[in-house]
């Protein structure tokens, strides 16, 4: 099997799981408080930042500090548990497949899931910014190049974190211990 077919097999496995729904929940959870507390973006108290930048930063701070690491941990554990629950890893390892390619395919799927969550975060930002713009009569929508550049920086910073989480999840067989670390 070549690498792309291994990635395709891994993507088919997660299609039946609820990983995409699990990735959507933190995206929604992080932007609801921003809509509710939209009027606080105008109370800057001498901080030289515009309300629209404050809205953007406040919305993505929770994603960066907590939700992205938590989502990556959950995704790595779920990816490994789909293999272990149905003894799929034993079946895969009995085939003439390189274990290195198999691990790299899992890492690629994890990175694709993180990218999908980032795209959902961008979409949620623009939806919430449009709602708050309508509520406050002030334009909270930033230009797409600025938003995408910052989100790509967050995504690039999450790649080494995903590698560490996948390594820990692979080395520690119990899902409780791998989530705990």
Positions of predicted regions on the chain:
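Central hydrophobic cores of alpha-helical transmembrane segments
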Residues: 23-30, 177-181
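Helix-loop interface residues and adjacent transmembrane-helix termini in multi-pass membrane transporters
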Residues: 83, 96, 171-172
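Secretory targeting signals
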Residues: 26-74, 104-173
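Transmembrane helix boundary and interhelical loop/hinge segments in multi-pass membrane proteins
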Residues: 74-93
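Aromatic- and glycine-rich beta-strand/loop motifs that create alpha-glucan
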Residues: 1-27
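Short helix-to-coil transition segments within interhelical loops
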Residues: 93-99
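Short loop-to-helix capping motifs
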Residues: 17-18, 98, 173-175
């Amino acid at each position: 099997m070549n690498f792309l077919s291994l990635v395709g097999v891994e993507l088919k496995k997660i299609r039946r799981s609820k990983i995409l729904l699990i990735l959507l929940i933190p995206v929604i959870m992080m932007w609801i408080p921003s809509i509710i507390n939209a009027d606080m973006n105008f109370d800057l108290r001498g901080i030289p930042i515009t309300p629209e930048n404050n809205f953007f930063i406040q919305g993505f701070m929770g994603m960066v500090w907590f939700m992205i690491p938590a989502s990556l941990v959950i995704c790595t554990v779920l990816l490994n548990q789909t293999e272990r629950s149905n003894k799929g890893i034993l079946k895969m390892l009995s085939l003439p497949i390189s274990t290195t390619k198999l691990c790299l395919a899992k890492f690629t799927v994890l990175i694709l899931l993180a990218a999908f969550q980032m795209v959902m975060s961008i979409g949620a930002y623009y939806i919430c910014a449009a709602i708050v713009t309508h509520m406050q009569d002030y334009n909270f929508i930033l230009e797409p190049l600025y938003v995408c550049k910052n989100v790509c920086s967050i995504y690039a910073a999450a790649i080494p974190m995903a590698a560490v989480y996948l390594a820990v999840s692979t080395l520690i067989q119990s899902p409780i211990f791998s989530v705990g670390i």
